[in-house]
Curated annotation (Swiss-Prot):
Subcellular location: Cytoplasm
GO molecular function, one term: pyridoxine 5'-phosphate synthase activity
Residue positions binding 1-deoxy-D-xylulose 5-phosphate: 8-9, 44, 49, 99
Annotated protein name in UniProt: Pyridoxine 5'-phosphate synthase
Source organism (scientific name): Prosthecochloris aestuarii (strain DSM 271 / SK 413)
Length: 236
């Protein structure tokens, strides 16, 4: 299983003091040097953490795989085509939310999505869609032409009892299996940490996990190098 590191909250910490440090690009390079297979950043419409210049510098620096999380807007489409990350992940976005709160409503926005992703793919960029682990959403992602789905693991991360965790894990496992049967590659992310990630090692269909907050929080205490290596030891 591969690890993609989200560096958004390095930028959050930097922006708290309107400073130049810590630098998300430096964090990304350290993550790559210590085994991360990809770097994730979310250029939100309000630019609350990652800024346009961060994205430009990340594109210059990242040597593995750059995943640009973004809303399905014309502005972001143009930015993606100009910047050319290896991958974009379409996510829902609300200005009042602290973090992404749920999967992309692919059923509601299906027709727009089909038109939206073609110019991106024509530019040589793969498309992933952040969705709930539900068969109908997966089916729509496949028929729209996406290459990848990222399964929303937020509800799983909030479960408390073993029974609740197992129920949600089975839901994710079933969704991952179905997605692979439809020819999609599968990523998982949101709310995963150094403890609740462990059962995901048994879901062979999930090729990568995307982790941000938990890893950056640990990096604040032990350093980015150690935080990345610790996570890689757990997932592999």
């Amino acid at each position: 299983m591969r690890l993609a590191v989200n560096v958004d909250h390095i930028a959050t910490l930097r922006n708290a003091r309107n400073a130049s440090l810590p630098d998300p690009v430096t964090a990304a390079v350290i993550a790559e040097l210590n085994g991360a297979s990809g770097i994730v950043c979310h250029l939100r419409e309000d630019r609350r953490h990652i800024k346009d210049r961060d994205l430009e510098r990340l594109r210059e620096a990242v040597t593995t795989r750059l995943d640009l999380e973004m809303a399905m807007t014309t502005e972001m489409q143009h930015i993606a085509i100009r910047t050319k990350p290896e991958l974009i992940t379409l996510v829902p976005e609300k200005r009042e939310e602290l973090t992404t709160e749920g999967g992309f409503d692919i059923i509601r926005h299906y027709d727009t999505l089909c038109r939206y992703i073609k110019p991106v793919q024509d530019a040589g960029i793969e498309v992933s869609i952040f969705i709930e682990p539900e068969e109908e959403a997966i089916e729509r992602a496949a028929s729209a032409g996406a290459e990848i789905v990222e399964l929303h693991t937020g509800p799983y991360s909030l479960k408390k009892t073993p029974a609740e965790l197992e129920t949600e894990l089975m839901r994710i496992r079933k969704a991952a299996t179905f997605a692979r049967s439809r020819g999609l590659r599968v990523v998982a992310g949101h709310g995963l940490d150094y403890f609740n990630i462990v059962p995901f090692r048994t879901i062979e269909e999930i090729e990568e996990v995307s982790i941000g907050h938990a890893l950056i929080a640990r990096a604040a205490l032990v350093g980015m190098e150690t935080a990345v290596r610790d996570m890689l030891r757990i997932i592999n």
